[in-house]
């Protein structure tokens, strides 16, 4: 395990040096080492032990004349904990191990103490063979000894420290906000905590410190941050841990959107350049409006490394004889095209698989035109005139060997389907995993139409400041109002959402009224915020990048559990601690609670 930060060793009876920091400069020095038996090899006359500590591995040698040591070492199991004393010697030239930082030396030990002899292991630590996630999580303390996971946790610690240093240099103040707070009906489900002192009442674990950090702005702390634990009762995903996660929570007073962008871009550029081999594509990060990103990439979380872009061809089909496309040239609908260069001569299987994926995304089918060596082919060709084909070629810059895929229908639905196809075709390209292609998504709609409830709803954060403030709310159609909301995205992963906040009570009342809330409802739900804003609130805004996701990206991990020391499984269970678990009746009575479990369905037959 390589650790780029030199270790300060506490000298005592267990150790004077660290395994991974020994090298040829320590030749003939007497050392004390302690750690875990990584591997043991008996070569007849000699026993070799790879001793591992937090800094790396060092090879120990027990010579045959040391009969007592030899006998003791023969019964050692892997992962036993030992402390040794010995002398550093240089390895023979043909025995040097260039993969180890201590590979030029070995330690001939003179005495050994077995601090803890390990029982047979549930899985191998040294070989890192594939192991079921269930077993890994049950014995997480053992899993954490494995090199890659161990290094991920060390990296996470170093990254957190670097973030703190950077923000402190930018005059941010770290402030801890409450863990026990009130429940909010918005967002994900809360984790509830019953109150013993107030029977029938509950605290909630915070889904985010959102309201507290805004109140800190009102309190006169102009730059706040916190590595904040957040709790949401939601299902697991590869990039989301169930139960709890950590975010870099930030808020700033007297700022505009671009001021916050500059701070976060500077921080990300700093930690990437100093702590990672990865490189950022472009600084400042591109700013892309929500409308533009949906039109071009079909998602508000685009992976800009994919060399494909959706193009609008609605105007080309206004008078087309192909009625399926012509009827989707009216307002609110569109016709989109996705050109894949050099793939026009693929087999039928290629197109069948693409159509299957399009149907999985919600499309009725997938129209396409292949520009093969012998001419244009595909199910759409017979419906298009020569003029239509020429217009397409010119508009899309099509060449022989290309293929163009089409989607048509309602604007948002069509964009999303074509965005899904863009991601599907990403496998045709070799994307650089060391490239970090960040972007800001801006100008989100303030409202959206809820088809199910047949009403106007907030599309994102209801506490965002509308662009144009009160004038926009009073004079514009609700669905045309934009908000000062923004997302930061990297390689198709959303790291965070943020916003410039609505700090003016009358604008807040009006914004909620458009979404169907009365003043009384707003006061009932958010009265403490309204009251604070009436007593002098500065303009402010913030963001909260997910720390777990950022570490996941920088460590090249596909699963967020690989960067969390003690994660839950996908069923929100801690297999190591057997949580959640039942509690005693006495504990429930003390909290004035009674558990009523759902009735099990009786098996028929």
From Swiss-Prot:
Keyword presence, ATP-binding = yes
The UniProt record lists the keyword Ligase: yes
- What broad class of enzyme is this? ligase
Which InterPro entries is this protein grouped with?
Aa-tRNA-synt_II, aa-tRNA-synth_II, aa-tRNA-synth_II/BPL/LPL, Asp-tRNA-ligase_1, Asp-tRNA-ligase_1_N, Asp/Asn-tRNA-synth_IIb, AspRS_core, GAD-like_sf
Q: Where is this site: Important for tRNA non-discrimination?
A: 43
Q: Which reaction does it catalyse?
A: tRNA(Asx) + L-aspartate + ATP = L-aspartyl-tRNA(Asx) + AMP + diphosphate
MF term (GO), any:
nucleic acid binding
Q: Which residues bind ATP?
A: 232-234, 494, 546-549
Which keywords label this protein? Answer: Aminoacyl-tRNA synthetase, ATP-binding, Cytoplasm, Ligase, Nucleotide-binding, Protein biosynthesis
| Pfam families recorded | GAD, tRNA-synt_2, tRNA_anti-codon
Binding, L-aspartate = 186, 232, 460, 501
The cellular location(s) given in this protein's UniProt record come to:
Cytoplasm
The EC number(s) attached to this protein equal: 6.1.1.23
Q: Where is this region: Aspartate?
A: 210-213
Give GO BP annotations, semicolon-separated. aspartyl-tRNA aminoacylation
Q: Which Gene3D superfamilies match?
A: Bira Bifunctional Protein, Domain 2 (3.30.930.10), GAD-like domain (3.30.1360.30), Nucleic acid-binding proteins (2.40.50.140)
What subunit structure does UniProt give? Homodimer.
The free-text function statement in the UniProt record for this protein reads: Aspartyl-tRNA synthetase with relaxed tRNA specificity since it is able to aspartylate not only its cognate tRNA(Asp) but also tRNA(Asn). Reaction proceeds in two steps: L-aspartate is first activated by ATP to form Asp-AMP and then transferred to the acceptor end of tRNA(Asp/Asn).
Q: Which family does it belong to?
A: Belongs to the class-II aminoacyl-tRNA synthetase family. Type 1 subfamily.
Q: What is this protein called?
A: Aspartate--tRNA(Asp/Asn) ligase
Q: Which organism is it from?
A: Chlorobium chlorochromatii (strain CaD3)
Lineage of the organism: Bacteria, Pseudomonadati, Chlorobiota, Chlorobiia, Chlorobiales
């Amino acid at each position: 395990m390589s650790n780029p930060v030199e270790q300060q060793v506490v000298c005592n009876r267990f150790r004077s040096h660290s395994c991974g920091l020994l090298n040829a400069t320590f030749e003939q020095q007497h050392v004390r080492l302690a750690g875990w038996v990584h591997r043991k090899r008996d070569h007849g006359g000699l026993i070799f032990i790879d001793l591992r500590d937090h800094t790396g591995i060092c090879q120990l040698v027990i010579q045959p004349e040391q009969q007592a040591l030899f006998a003791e070492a023969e019964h050692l199991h892997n992962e036993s904990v030992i402390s040794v004393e010995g002398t550093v010697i240089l390895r023979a030239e043909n025995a040097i191990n260039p993969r180890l930082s201590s590979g030029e030396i070995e330690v001939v030990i003179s005495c050994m103490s077995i601090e803890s002899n390990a029982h047979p292991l549930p899985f191998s630590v040294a070989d890192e063979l594939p192991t079921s996630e269930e077993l890994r999580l049950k014995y997480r303390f053992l899993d954490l000894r494995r090199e890659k996971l161990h290094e991920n946790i060390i990296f996470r610690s170093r990254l957190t420290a670097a973030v703190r240093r950077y923000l402190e240099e930018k005059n941010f103040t770290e402030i801890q906000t409450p863990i026990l707070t009130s429940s909010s009906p918005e967002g994900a489900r809360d984790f509830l905590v019953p109150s013993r002192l107030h029977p029938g009442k509950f605290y909630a674990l915070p889904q985010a410190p959102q309201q507290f950090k805004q109140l800190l702005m009102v309190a006169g702390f102009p730059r706040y941050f916190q590595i904040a634990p957040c709790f949401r009762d939601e299902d697991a995903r590869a990039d989301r841990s169930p139960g709890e996660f950590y975010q870099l929570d930030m808020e700033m007073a007297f700022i505009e959107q671009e001021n916050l962008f500059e701070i976060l871009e500077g921080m990300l550029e700093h930690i990437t350049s100093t702590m990672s081999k990865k490189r950022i594509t472009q600084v400042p990060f591109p700013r892309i409006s929500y409308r533009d990103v949906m039109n071009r990439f079909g998602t508000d979380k685009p992976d800009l490394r994919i060399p494909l872009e959706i193009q609008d061809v609605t105007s080309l089909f206004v008078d087309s004889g192909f009625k399926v496309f012509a009827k989707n040239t009216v307002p609110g609908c569109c016709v989109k095209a996705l050109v894949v260069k050099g793939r026009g001569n693929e087999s039928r299987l290629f197109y069948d698989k693409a159509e299957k994926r399009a149907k999985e995304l919600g499309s009725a089918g997938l129209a396409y035109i292949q520009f093969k060596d012998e001419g244009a082919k595909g199910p759409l060709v017979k419906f298009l005139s020569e003029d239509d084909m020429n217009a397409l070629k010119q508009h899309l810059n099509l060449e022989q060997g290309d293929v163009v895929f089409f989607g048509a229908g309602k604007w948002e639905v069509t964009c999303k389907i074509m965005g899904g196809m863009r991601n599907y075709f990403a496998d045709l390209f070799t994307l650089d995993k060391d490239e970090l292609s960040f972007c800001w998504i801006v100008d989100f709609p303030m409202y959206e139409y809820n088809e199910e409830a047949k009403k106007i709803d907030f599309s994102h954060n209801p506490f965002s400041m509308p662009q144009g403030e009160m004038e926009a709310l009073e004079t514009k159609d609700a669905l045309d109002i934009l908000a000062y909301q923004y997302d930061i995205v990297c390689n198709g992963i959303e790291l965070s959402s943020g916003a410039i906040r609505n700090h003016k009570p009358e604008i807040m009342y009006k914004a909620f009224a458009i979404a169907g809330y009365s003043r009384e409802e707003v006061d009932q739900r958010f009265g403490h915020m309204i009251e604070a804003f009436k007593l002098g609130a500065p303009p402010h805004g913030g963001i909260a990048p997910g720390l777990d996701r950022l570490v996941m990206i920088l460590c090249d991990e596909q699963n967020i559990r690989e960067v969390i020391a003690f994660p839950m499984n996908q069923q929100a269970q801690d297999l190591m601690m057997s949580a959640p678990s039942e509690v005693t009746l006495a504990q429930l009575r003390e909290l004035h609670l009674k558990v009523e479990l759902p009735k099990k369905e009786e098996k028929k037959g």
